[in-house]
Curated annotation (Swiss-Prot):
Entry function: Catalyzes the interconversion of methylthioribose-1-phosphate (MTR-1-P) into methylthioribulose-1-phosphate (MTRu-1-P).
InterPro entries for the chain: IF-2B-related, IF-M1Pi, IF_2B-like_C, Initiation_fac_2B_a/b/d, M1Pi_N, NagB/RpiA_transferase-like
Pathway: Amino-acid biosynthesis; L-methionine biosynthesis via salvage pathway; L-methionine from S-methyl-5-thio-alpha-D-ribose 1-phosphate: step 1/6
Reactions listed under catalytic activity: 5-(methylsulfanyl)-alpha-D-ribose 1-phosphate = 5-(methylsulfanyl)-D-ribulose 1-phosphate
UniProt organism field: Yersinia enterocolitica serotype O:8 / biotype 1B (strain NCTC 13174 / 8081)
PANTHER family: METHYLTHIORIBOSE-1-PHOSPHATE ISOMERASE
Binding residue positions for substrate: R54, G55, A56, R91, Q192, N243, K244
Any one biological process term the GO annotation gives: L-methionine salvage from methylthioadenosine
Pfam families per record: IF-2B (PF01008)
Active site feature: D233 (proton donor)
Signal sequence, start to end: none
Official protein name in the record: Methylthioribose-1-phosphate isomerase
Lineage, uppermost ranks: Bacteria, Pseudomonadati, Pseudomonadota, Gammaproteobacteria, Enterobacterales
Amino acid sequence: MQTLNTLDLQTTSLKIVDGKLWILDQQTLPQRQEWLSADTVELLIEHIQALRVRGAPLIGLSASLLLALLAERGLPQAQLEQALIALRESRPTAVNLMNNLARMQQALLHANWVAAMTHEALRLVEEDRELCERIAQHGVQLVKPDSNLLTHCNTGGLATAGIGTAIGVLLRAHQQGKIKQVWVDETRPLLQGGRLTAWELGELGIPYQLICDSMAASLMAQGRVDAVWVGADRIAANGDVANKIGTYSLAVLANYHRIPFYVAAPHTTHDPDCPNGAAIPIEQRDASEVKGVSGGFGHCQWAPANAPVYNPAFDVTPAALISGWVLDSGVITPGQVAAGFFQPKN
């Protein structure tokens, strides 16, 4: 039987070495590349909530791999069930975590549950790699030659086991010579665009320029953006999409300027039991993230220490503002969504 304890597995941002789970600290990038132990449920939850490990697909994969490792070490089923529940509650918006853990829970019910959990965790990693490739294959067909594209937050190998979702599309388009430049929103308040996407695009050799979030409207008005590409943390049954805060603003701007707005995501991000965007739980984060900044580059606070802060991690983009949902199964059109593509199947 193949076991994680004897397997060295590595993606861009997580790895298993000598039977232990490690994550690349995404709070210290790009200044430092530091690997942190995520070998207990408590540690992994701390890393997830501190955004040291982030991205809807990657959160689900890291939780699944840790559960399989714990099973191989002999943790009893009852304790694994408790670990699964704790991990499920670590971040409420990203549905990939719930979907992956539902599959791990089914494996836990298997007669040979240790082997079943290992098999399922490895299968989830391989599936995510394949899903990223399929998304890119479909999405690249929508990219016109000599394109200036705009992206938000981080949707690459740092957020998945593969080449990424929206960034995967950009990579394949770049390899086909279709990209003139990518505009990278810095993505306030935690700067996932400025810290992570800029770093990834640089590593991939994709030409880009970093912008403040507030500059996107000006670029669109000048005709310097041909399409917007973003990822998703949850897709509701009516096609509404929850994604990093600021995504909705871009969708409104793109709609006004008649610019295509595409959402790239695996089918595992779809939640048929969630009727619409209003039903998606939106995580509220600590006020300190808005009043200042911290990371591998140090710490700075610019707002009054007692300033009241509103800090949702995500917003919801209505389906009416989306030009296409680029899934691993293909490009889903607004007409298909209106006809019930994302609705629960009886």
